[in-house]
Amino acid sequence: MEFIYRYAWLIPILPFLGSMIIGLGLISLRRATQTLRWRFAFFNIVLLGIALIFSISILISQLNGHPPYKWLIEWIVTNQFSLEIGYSIDPLTSVMLVLVTSVAILVMIYSDSYMSYDQGYVRFFAYLSLFTASMLGLVLSPNLVQIYVFWELVGMCSYLLIGFWFTRPAAADACQKAFVTNRVGDFGLFLGILGLYWVTGSFEFQTISNRLSNVLLGDFVLPGSHPVQVELLVLFNLLVFLGPMAKSAQFPLHVWLPDAMEGPTPISALIHAATMVAAGVFLVARMFPIFNQFPIVMGFIAWIGAITAIIAAIIAVTQNDLKKGLAYSTISQLGYMIMAMGVGSYTAGLFHLITHAYSKALLFLGSGSVIHGMEPVVGFNPSKNQNMLFMGKMREFMPVTAITFLLGTLSLCGIPPMACFWSKDEILSQTFQAQPILWIIAWVTAGLTSFYMFRMYFLVFEGKQFRGGEFIYDVRAKSLPKESNKKILIPLIILALVTTLVGFVGTPFNNMFAKFINLTRLEEHPFEWNEFLSMSGSSVGIALIGLTLASLIYKESKIDANQIANTLTPLYKLSFNKFYIDHIYQIGFIKVNRSLAQKALELDQQIIDGFINFTGFFTIMTGEILKYVENGRVQSYVFVIIFATLIFVLASQGF
């Protein structure tokens, strides 16, 4: 097994190598690379498959009790500063490696069919491999500096993939929005890392944690420095958390994620399941021993997660775009994870990260299958082929997609025995013990989750067939939706099986996941049937209420949705307009910045440019005047000399 650990650096290098080979081919041998397109895709899938085998081997080794492994080399060494790079493997790393590689390889297989007719097919696989390599590098990083490097690479890849169809104005705007929004969080993360280094003199997680503990006890001060106020330490930790707030789309930096749906559907699955948004939760998990020393920081994290969860769930209720509805669902579930971390439920938050990743990957790939099936009917217009109001009874045309999508929906809603039931139930239980007010928010969010997810399912696969108008399913034109091919369905079936089974590793009866991942042993407590039945009963009960309401409104049509919207007009408008957060940013930041930029332009043109232009004009005119002094006549020169001398003498006498 030592061989696997010594060569674990190959896990991110292999997909990175595949990306570089495609990139060089597109630059130097573009026509040949485009001709060999599926071969390059297969090559990338094989490389990622090897990385998956390595990852599974490491996970098995960690399960068998292999101690954490760290390989470091000194990169920069001076008298006062040293920086090491390398990789670190522990139970958390091993789980994340398998998660990222398994979801990524299924997305690649799916993309081979989904993107087959796209002109950027080869470029897409290059971006996809680079994206996966960046996340794998982040997971293996042993310190904050290395994490920050791969953190930025993940952000760059998301920019490229969200704007993959860059000729579309909406996609171009979306990738810029994602990039700028994440700059806010990344800048905070950068300042926080520098602040923690200033206090502790280290970028290593364990060293920072230990030294901060000593700083709080007054037993540690860096040579040449003074004792640090606790408030400053809190500020540094909050700045670090600003990075995960943006990357994991937490309120109020969540606005980029719904617009990220402008990218191809396979990358939406990867962003929302195993890579970009998971990076934020992963960093919070890595920083957990540090954050946990500051109750104010933990409380802030918990409340940010809870607010994000409830706001995103309310917004998701009124979304008609299939992918954007799932995007707000992702934001809400990420809020669950962050809230769990904030209340100290480390293992529950990580377990929900795993179960949600597979469930959400299944739902996004299922939505892509539906969109693919709708394209022959309504064309390639996203406003139609993603609009749930144009769908209905798709189950008759796409039975496999419908079944797998239903399994993903059941899981996300927390219906037993699906995966997310076990993780969500554990989060609710831990939250109830820590802060009952947050439990109420999380419990209501669970009901809303069930309602909007089954609303999606019923609008797409059940309900009325001709909801969008009789022209949608034109039998005479033979333009009915049809089931996707095997390359799309096989990943869906595999993810459906994983979604059904993966939750059993974290059941409260024998929580193998907690025993494996929880190195700090912070949450060990005996299992109690009464507690389990009360917590699970309340969460399943609210989920069933949401399911029933969605069925009555969108499947059986016994309740008029428009009447409810008219009755709850203020709340409906608030939800439909996304709590006006985008409007606030548009007015408060974009318009103000543009106005300031316009004023700066006017100042530059009229004042600064005016002064410079006047200086040039004055110089030219002075030269034009003075050139007549040089007339070649000696008499004129003598006159000037005498006149200047006379002026000088008179001036001297006067003074």
UniProtKB/Swiss-Prot annotation:
GO biological process, one term: ATP synthesis coupled electron transport
Enzyme Commission code: 7.1.1.-
Ranges annotated as spanning the membrane: 7-27, 40-60, 89-109, 124-144, 147-167, 185-205, 226-246, 265-285, 296-316, 334-354, 361-381, 402-422, 434-454, 488-508, 533-553, 635-655
Mode of membrane association: Multi-pass membrane protein
Pfam families the UniProt entry points to: Proton_antipo_C (PF01010), Proton_antipo_M (PF00361), Proton_antipo_N (PF00662)
Primary subcellular site in the record, as a coarse category: plastid
Location of this chain's protein in the cell: Plastid, Chloroplast thylakoid membrane
GO cellular component terms, A-Z: chloroplast thylakoid membrane
GO MF terms, alphabetically ordered: NADH dehydrogenase (ubiquinone) activity; quinone binding
Cited InterPro entries: NADH_UbQ_OxRdtase_chlpt_su5_C, NADHpl_OxRdtase_5_subgr, ND/Mrp_TM, NU5C-like, Proton_antipo_N
Complex and partners: NDH is composed of at least 16 different subunits, 5 of which are encoded in the nucleus.
Similarity-based family: Belongs to the complex I subunit 5 family.
Protein name: NAD(P)H-quinone oxidoreductase subunit 5, chloroplastic
Organism placement in taxonomy: Eukaryota, Viridiplantae, Streptophyta, Chlorokybophyceae, Chlorokybales
Encoding gene, per UniProt annotation: ndhF
